[in-house]
Curated annotation (Swiss-Prot):
PANTHER family: 2-OXOADIPATE DEHYDROGENASE COMPLEX COMPONENT E1 (PTHR23152:SF4), 2-OXOGLUTARATE DEHYDROGENASE (PTHR23152)
Protein's name in the database: 2-oxoglutarate dehydrogenase E1 component
Organism superkingdom: Bacteria
Role noted for this protein: E1 component of the 2-oxoglutarate dehydrogenase (OGDH) complex which catalyzes the decarboxylation of 2-oxoglutarate, the first step in the conversion of 2-oxoglutarate to succinyl-CoA and CO(2).
The protein's enzyme class: oxidoreductase
InterPro entries on file: 2oxoglutarate_DH_E1, 2oxoglutarate_DH_E1_bac, DH_E1, KGD_C_sf, ODO-1/KGD_C, THDP-binding, Transketolase-like_Pyr-bd
SMART domains xrefs: Transket_pyr (SM00861)
Species in which this protein is naturally found: Bacillus cereus (strain B4264)
Pfam families linked to this entry: E1_dh, OxoGdeHyase_C, Transket_pyr
Lineage: Bacteria, Bacillati, Bacillota, Bacilli, Bacillales
GO MF terms held by the record: oxoglutarate dehydrogenase (succinyl-transferring) activity; thiamine pyrophosphate binding
An annotated GO BP: glycolytic process
Quaternary structure, from the entry: Homodimer. Part of the 2-oxoglutarate dehydrogenase (OGDH) complex composed of E1 (2-oxoglutarate dehydrogenase), E2 (dihydrolipoamide succinyltransferase) and E3 (dihydrolipoamide dehydrogenase); the complex contains multiple copies of the three enzymatic components (E1, E2 and E3).
Length: 955
């Protein structure tokens, strides 16, 4: 039979779901049961019933000329079309993707649909009618169903129906339904794959037998993770990728280090033996970390290509490495050596994130990070996610760890294609890896592989998993390893014989034994309780001249106040900016936001790129920054910092999503990988920064001590008690001070625009040096425009950052000073305002006030020199606005005690211990604040009075 001329048959162009729709419409047309699309109604009137035909062959596979009009079989065609789509959408429910379970069975929706069609029904329908792209040899609908079941219900299973882009969805189906993904591997590649699996298994078993009881968090059960990573890395390299960033937890990490990142076995064994070995490169800080947290950087290559692979250092806080690694990738993708926004090339780098099956749906940082994937400020052109799925979280079964069928279901909400694959089918795993990298490189979007295996031992090697999962561990005990399974397959296929398989095994064992023999005995000669901090860190940041010539500042300011002709600045914003016009003149005053912009511009002119992000950072939470302008007519944006002259460094400022943890992790990672860049994260209010506490604890404060991982990240945390209640008052400075040690970061609470200008420039000057460290700034809110925080041009052009400032016009009669008051930030300004107001009568000859601008490291020498001036000093008082159990008091108390010596008392004035940072009544707040100020400045005040209102005492 030959095909009719389709130019006279309008139905020939309808296939699959479109065909089903046409048939449904014809049924409505005939029965009059509903409205019919007008265009189709016209076709029905001209051509009659839809008629479909195809070339056929004779025999059992023959599909004769088929027409609903001739057969009256409209319902069967619809059912076939629906069945095809259901196999594509729900084939995963029947797939054998879990090596610990038999192939899925039971009455699913898909099985019900299949039972309603006989083989004869299917044979009668031409293949092209329901699958227009059917490959050669597929003649009938029965062939189609067999073929699609083979694709969608075996050891690879796919979830693509949630993908919203029809082009992507069609590409994915075409890829898996064609033969391109599952082309048989060459015998050479099959043998190489077996060797890789033998190396992975041999390494793990060697550790298990040699270092009995030591934690290693074995990969066994998902051994194919290593070849999957190999495939993704090398396929990426073939596409020109220069950097591959990997983030993963401790499960399987040692094997990934040894095999993917080529860390020598001997170095791994030395870590287990606590031995020193020649050639081992230290990749940790002075306190170090356990071996299964450490990262590595390595150039990986084969005969054709090479690429740099970075495995990020990682704490045991599962999944928190995810945004850090995304930041690595974005930094690697961007060219920051030009003015304006940096140029991003997503083909230069990509991320692989290895997740746990319990952690992926369980940890909120996962969804926070996924939400970054399509955002302009954070997208990295697609991440490949691999869930190393061993179906248990420590001792918790999957039915207790998630509310969804699959651990990967969270990804559906972010439009991410998902492939489930049986970890006991090595070639299927490689097919999944190949699809993942092709999709990522083509569409620049995320892709997820759910690598389903098991965990051969307990959570760590000292656990007995049979205590909590007795049934499954009976199966696992008798279950062959993936290496053994694949070796049997290769022998059955005639690729290798038993002797050749044994030779591969023996070669691996000999290599392991040889490398172990190179490791000397344990070396405890330098074991010591004291861990030495590097000298350059211990010395702290040296005083740096950060002034900028006035003429340069004036030129910058002029540029900051200009915009393209025809650009319509919002009138209110225009007035704010115009007020800055004369700020650098003789009688001008510079407010906080202008000082910041001047600092940014001068830093850029010196060649340092800047990246600033936060939930409202372009405008500023308090409508103060206005660093990105919006045209009132077109909504176009413009930043004056992109057009200033003499700049060869990029500037980017982005509004972030409503997330703290993921964004802080991202910016930290960006800064680690771009150490020459001034990277800043701004909290909307400092109160909300504690949702990123794990990042502060595990990375920002301790990353260098643990891993030697340097960062100069700047945290801008709006802080200050202004009667706005417990959620808009405190950035929790006590927590940052509690973490302060070994000069790990700088914590500051400033009182002037000039101080902010200088500390930003100082921070920029140490980037990329051994002296670098993070900067934690308690930034102002009401003080942004406060008259007492304004600065003059000369204060920016001369000098440097001062860690402590003395209150002007006090301490003029040193011999009369009895009380030295120390405070910081807004509290210091409240004291200054009271002093300058002259409303109350204090004997100010007896009081001196010092503002501690840099809380950590504490400027002890500066303060000590001030104390020495006052021979008759009786007491040193710390005054703060926070409750006594918060703020800086518990950090300051021992410092004051040491400064005071034996003859001078120390004391505290402030709010008493409280469980909440602040009260909610603004009037009560005001009354408390006035009491604190009054008691701080009144030397005659009798300690321990009015304790109900505020806490006042001395030692």
């Amino acid at each position: 039979m030959t095909r009719k001329n389709t130019t006279t048959n309008p139905w020939a162009k309808f296939h699959g779901p479109n065909l089903g729709y046409v048939i449904e419409q014809y049924d409505l047309y005939v029965t009059g049961a509903g409205s019919v699309d007008p265009e189709l109604q016209e076709l029905f009137e001209i051509f009659g019933a839809p008629s479909f035909q195809d070339d056929v062959v004779t025999g059992d596979n023959t599909a004769t000329h088929f027409s609903p009009q001739n057969t009256g079989n409209i319902e069967k065609i619809l059912k076939v079309v629906q069945l095809v789509e259901q196999i594509r959408s729900f084939g995963h429910t029947l797939a054998h993707i879990n090596p610990m379970e038999d192939a899925a069975n039971g009455q699913s929706l898909l099985e019900k649909a299949m039972s309603e069609l006989s083989d004869a029904d299917l044979k009668a329908i031409p293949a092209k009618t329901v699958w227009p792209d059917a490959p050669e040899g597929i003649h009938t609908a029965l062939d189609v169903i067999h073929r699609l079941k083979d694709v969608y219900t075996k050891s690879l299973a796919y979830e693509f129906s949630h993908i919203q882009d029809s082009e992507e969805r069609a590409w994915l189906h075409q890829m898996v339904e064609s033969n391109s993904l599952r082309q048989p591997l060459s015998n050479k590649k099959r043998t190489a794959l077996l060797k890789r699996l033998t190396a992975v298994e041999g390494f793990e078993q060697f550790l298990h037998k040699t270092f009995v009881g030591q934690k290693r968090f074995s990969i066994e059960g998902v051994d194919m993770l290593v070849p999957v990573l190999d495939e993704i890395v090398l396929e990426g390299a073939k596409n020109g990728v220069e950097d591959v960033m990997i983030g993963m937890a401790h499960r399987g990490r040692l094997s990934v280090l040894a095999h993917v990142l080529e860390k020598p076995y001997s170095h791994m064994f030395a870590e287990f033996k606590h031995a020193k070995i020649e050639g081992a490169v230290a990749n940790s800080g002075w306190t170090g970390d356990v071996k299964y947290h450490l990262g590595r950087e390595q150039v990986v290559s084969n005969e054709e290509v090479s690429t740099r692979v970075t495995l990020a250092n990682n704490p045991s806080h599962l999944e928190f490495v995810n945004p850090v690694v995304e930041g690595f990738a974005r930094a690697a993708q961007e060219n920051r050596k030009k003015s304006g926004l940096p140029d991003q090339d997503t083909s230069k780098s990509f991320v692989i994130l290895v997740h746990g099956d319990a952690a992926f749906p369980g940890q909120g940082i996962v969804s926070e990070t996924l939400n970054l994937s399509r955002l302009n400020a954070y997208q990295t052109g697609g991440t490949i996610h691999v869930i190393a799925n061993n179906a248990v979280g420590f001792t918790t079964d999957s039915y207790d760890s998630r509310s969804t069928k699959y651990s990967s279901d969270l990804a559906k909400g972010f439009d991410i294609p998902i492939v489930h694959v049986n970890a006991d089918d090595p070639e299927a795993c490689l097919a999944a890896a190949n699809l993942a990298i092709q999709y990522r490189m083509l569409f620049k979007k995320d892709f997820l592989i759910d690598l389903i295996g098991y965990r051969r031992y307990g959570h760590n090697e000292m656990d007995d998993p049979a205590v909590t999962q007795p049934q499954v561990y009976k199966k696992i005990k008798n279950h062959p390893t993936v290496r053994a399974i694949y070796a049997d397959q290769l022998q059955a296929a005639g690729v290798l014989n038993a002797d050749e398989v044994e030779t591969i095994t023996q070669f691996t064992q000999e290599q392991l034994k040889s490398d172990y023999a190179q490791v000397p005995p344990a070396d405890t000669s330098d074991a010591t309780i004291h861990v030495k901090v590097p000298d350059v860190v211990a010395k702290g940041i040296q005083s740096i001249d950060t002034g900028v010539e006035i003429d340069s500042l004036r030129a910058i300011n002029e540029g900051l106040l200009s915009w393209p002709e025809g650009f319509n600045v919002y009138p209110k914003v225009k007035k704010i900016l115009e007020r800055r016009k004369d700020a650098l003149e003789e009688n001008g005053k510079i407010e906080w936001a202008l000082a910041e912009s001047l600092a940014f511009a001068s830093i850029l002119q010196e060649g340092t790129p800047i990246r600033l992000t936060g939930q409202d950072s372009q405008r500023g939470t308090f409508a103060h920054r206005h660093i990105v302008l919006h045209d009132t007519d077109t909504n176009e944006t413009y930043s004056p910092l992109h057009r200033l002259p003499n700049i060869n460094a990029s500037f980017s400022v982005h509004n972030s999503p409503l997330s703290e943890a993921a964004v802080v992790g991202y910016e930290y990672g960006y800064n680690v990988f771009a150490p020459e860049t001034l990277v800043m994260w701004e909290a909307q209010y400092g109160d909300f920064s504690n949702t990123a506490q794990a990042l502060f604890d595990q990375y920002v404060s301790a990353g260098r001590a643990k891993w030697g991982q340097k960062s100069g990240l700047v945290l801008l945390l709006p802080h200050g008690y202004e009667g706005q209640g417990p959620e808009h008052s405190s950035a929790r400075p006590e927590r940052f001070l509690q973490l302060a040690a070994e000069n790990n970061w700088t914590v500051a609470n400033l009182t002037s625009a000039a101080q902010y200008f200088h500390i930003l420039r100082r921070q920029a000057s140490i980037l990329g040096t051994e002296a670098v460290r993070p900067l934690v700034l308690m930034t102002p809110k009401s003080l942004l425009r406060h008259p007492l925080t304004l600065s003059t041009a000369s204060q920016l052009s001369e000098g440097r950052f001062q860690p402590a400032l003395e209150q002007e016009n006090l301490g003029m009669k040193p011999n009369k000073v009895k009380r030295l008051v120390l405070s910081t930030g807004k509290m210091a300004i409240d004291l200054a305002a009271e002093i300058e107001s002259g409303k109350h009568e204090y004997n100010l000859d007896e009081v001196h006030v010092v503002r501690i601008e840099q809380l950590y490291p504490f400027p002890a020498e500066k303060v000590q020199s001030i104390i020495k001036r006052f021979k008759n000093l009786e007491e040193i008082i710390w005054v703060q606005e926070e409750p006594r159990n918060m703020g800086a008091w518990h950090y300051m108390a021992p410092i004051l005690f040491e400064l005071a010596g034996d003859k001078v008392k120390t004391g505290y004035i402030g709010r008493p211990d409280r469980s909440s940072p602040s009260g909610g009544d603004p009037f009560a707040h005001k009354a408390e604040q006035e009491l604190i100020v009054a008691h701080a400045l009144d030397v005659k005040y009798n300690f321990r009075q009015d304790k109900q209102e505020i806490e006042v005492y001395s030692n």
